[in-house]
Amino acid sequence: FVNLSERVIAVKEIGESVAYREYELLRNLVRLGAPCVTPTAVITERADLSGNALNSVLVTEHLSYSLPYRALFSQYMRPETATRLIDALAVLLVRLHLLGFYWGDVSLSNTLFRRDAGAFAAYLVDAETGELHTEGLTQGKRLYDIDIARTNIIGELMDLQAGALLEPSVDTVEVGDRIVTRYTDLWEVLTGAETFDMGERWRVRQRIERLNK
């Protein structure tokens, strides 16, 4: 992170073609209203003081009041922190998939979190492996993203336990499985088809209540 004229920016060093690709992906996601960081620039033809070539960098705006998951666990070392982060990540993943975005590397590490009325809101911060499909995602791509998320989350939680940031009693596999169930439930509520008779308005109210939850 770099302080620049009362602004904070994030600088990510990557190859030139990858930097331009991620920049365009993030721009398109911002245009679509996705919860993600805002790209600012790609800087190329960099060199150190000795004249040696350096990789290009992608510059993004720092997301105010956001924290990476490790910082949150260092502040709130409670088992429920893990489940709340998973719930936030599930909401983010559903929103991205509805926009036709395949992430390709879903993880807590590639996400920033903000506190939101006792819960957390999640934001995509790394789109390097992503793909935007204007025609929508296939079920195969959605399920693969979920499987990647589960695997990565379990590994990240185990790493937190090894670093004494998460209680040993927490079942990391069970928490990792939660991303699958939460995503599946939310996706079904948002996209599932239901048929109502004229006299079953209570089912409409019930559907709205599920959406609000």
What positions do the PLM features span?
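Conserved ATP-binding subdomain of kinase catalytic cores across diverse folds
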Residues: 1-83, 87-104, 120, 152-154, ...
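Structured core elements
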Residues: 10, 112, 123-124
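Surface loops and adjacent helix of pleckstrin homology
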Residues: 14, 116, 136
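Short, glycine/acidic-enriched loop or turn micro-motifs at the edges of active sites
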Residues: 64, 108, 129
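Hydrophobic residue at the +6 position relative to the catalytic HRD Asp in the kinase catalytic loop
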Residues: 106-113
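Activation-loop N-terminal segment of eukaryotic-like protein kinases
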Residues: 113-119
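C-lobe/activation-segment region of protein kinase-like
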Residues: 120-196, 200-203
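Long, charge-rich C-terminal accessory regions
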Residues: 206-213
